[in-house]
UniProtKB/Swiss-Prot annotation:
Enzyme Commission number, as recorded: 3.1.11.6
CDD domains for the chain: ExoVII_LU_OBF
Protein name: Exodeoxyribonuclease 7 large subunit
Record carries keyword Hydrolase: yes
EC class: hydrolase
Compartments (UniProt record): Cytoplasm
GO MF annotations in UniProt: exodeoxyribonuclease VII activity; nucleic acid binding
Gene from which this protein is expressed: xseA
InterPro entries with a match to the protein in the record: Exonuc_VII_L, Exonuc_VII_lsu_C, OB-fold_nuc-bd_dom
């Protein structure tokens, strides 16, 4: 009897109001479940202006309403959202006004995938803050790759799917597998080493691929070491991890995210039909460009032709211009002659009014007198000059060396034509010239005393 809660409440003999029933039920629940941990998934999350948080905690079979009051909500560090798996600590209670059974929570912690998702969001926020997800870092994929490296597990359907796509779409592309574990404790270190090795091989692009799986299975692609290894690759890289709904940190860091490994292969495998279609499009664009260019050049040529007149036309215009200039020159010359003639007439009129007849007659008489005296004066001057010249000639003849030579003397000249005035200027055997009044003699010095020089004629 003691353990019968209904008997303790007196429900076997007492009729209660609804309020009394709800109150007693609340007290009973709070007494039996003073504190409990419950695990489930968040849904129907609501945040009114009061600061309280209301949500539903559910699993696959049941659900319970929860209330997290403001003072406790402020202590919850992780961001709450629908779908997050959590562990909630609190006490079971009942809202008497509606009779709703609920959990009054005081602590909310991530549970299972929830903890992983919180770690995912924390790392995502950190790397985004460093700029590793920035679009400026994203490199374009090569349009026509020749060598592609595949960082993935050597077993499984992933590598076969990738090879199948390339064989069908671009068999000319060389594929190289860089093997690595994609799950387990060693996966992170192996993926980092495989990425570093592949980046040194000179591939045109890399594919980081893994098939689908749970969040725990794919977690190695959410590790910071793998994310930084992807970011450090100098080779453009496509991340293809899991199924289309799976998103990993490596997807954000890579240059391109593909929803599946096969989709990654299609991104890098140029389809022959697509290439032909692209070439056809380029050919059409080229033809249109050429037509437009030809049309522009034709219009430009026509414009130049309109501006460039025929040489004959230019000659006719120049001839017409020359005729016009000739006529203008003639008219100007005639006007100039008329002006000059008019001025000359005026000058003649003025000259006739001031004719110097008497002055000219006197000047003419004076001129005639001077003309008569000029020949006589000229003869007198010429006679005086001739007499003076004859006197000078006589004086010159007296002092002339030629006159001395005429009296039997001679002038001795050395080889340089210099006159010999002293015997000391000669040497025995020296040849000299003796200039006479008539002709010259070649002589040789026999001796050169200060006494008269002895000369001998050369044979």
């Amino acid at each position: 009897m003691r353990n019968d809660p209904f008997q303790r409440l007196g429900l076997d003999r007492e009729v209660l109001t609804v309020s009394q029933l709800n109150q007693r039920a609340r007290l009973l629940l709070e007494d039996v479940f003073p504190q409990v941990w419950v695990e489930g998934e968040l849904s129907n999350l609501a945040r009114p202006a009061s600061g309280h948080v209301y949500f539903t905690l559910k699993d696959s079979n049941a659900q319970i309403r929860c209330a997290l009051f403001r003072q406790n909500a402020l202590r919850v560090r992780q961001a709450l959202r629908d779908g997050l798996a959590v562990k909630v600590r609190g006490k079971i209670s009942l809202f008497e006004g509606r009779g709703d059974y609920q959990l009054i929570a005081d602590t909310v912690e991530p549970a299972g995938d929830g903890a992983l998702r919180l770690a995912f969001e924390a790392l995502k926020e950190k790397l985004a803050g460093e700029g590793l997800f920035a679009s400026e870092r994203k490199r374009p994929l090569p349009a026509h790759p020749r060598r592609i490296g595949i960082v993935s597990s050597p077993s499984g359907a992933v590598i076969r799917d990738i090879i199948s796509v390339f064989r069908r779409r671009a068999p000319q592309v060389e594929l190289t597998l860089v093997p690595t574990a994609v799950q387990g404790r060693e996966a992170v270190a192996q993926i980092v080493r495989a990425l570093q090795l592949a980046d040194r091989q000179g591939f045109d692009a890399l594919i980081l691929a893994r098939g689908g799986g749970s969040l725990e299975d794919l977690w190695c692609f959410n590790e910071e070491a793998v994310a930084r290894a992807v970011a450090a690759c100098a080779t453009p890289i496509v991340s293809a991890v899991g199924h289309e709904t799976d998103v990993s940190i490596s997807d954000f860091v890579a240059d391109v995210r593909a929803p599946t490994p096969s989709a990654a292969a299609e991104l890098l495998a140029p389809n022959a039909g697509d290439l032909q279609q692209r070439l056809d499009g380029l050919r059409r664009r080229l033809v249109l460009r050429m037509r437009d260019q030809l049309l522009r050049e034709r219009l430009r040529l026509e414009g130049v032709a309109r501006r460039l007149r025929h040489p004959g036309e230019r000659l006719r215009q120049q001839a017409q211009r020359l005729d016009d200039l000739d006529m203008r020159l003639r008219r100007a010359f005639e006007r100039h002659l008329a002006v000059r003639h008019e001025r000359l007439v005026r000058l003649e009129t003025r000259l006739a009014a001031q004719h110097p007849g008497r002055t000219l007659a006197l000047l003419r008489q004076k001129l005639d007198s001077l003309a008569a005296r000029l020949p006589r004066a000229a003869r007198e001057v010429l006679k005086d000059r001739r007499q003076h010249l004859e006197g000078l000639a006589q004086t010159l003849n007296v002092v002339s060396p030629l006159a001395t030579l005429g009296r039997g003397y001679s002038i001795l000249l050395d080889e340089r034509g210099r006159a010999i005035r002293d015997a000391g200027q000669t040497q025995p055997g020296q040849r000299l010239k003796a200039r006479l009044a008539e002709g010259e003699l070649e002589v040789r010095v026999e001796d050169n005393h200060r006494t008269p020089v002895t000369l001998s004629l050369l044979d």
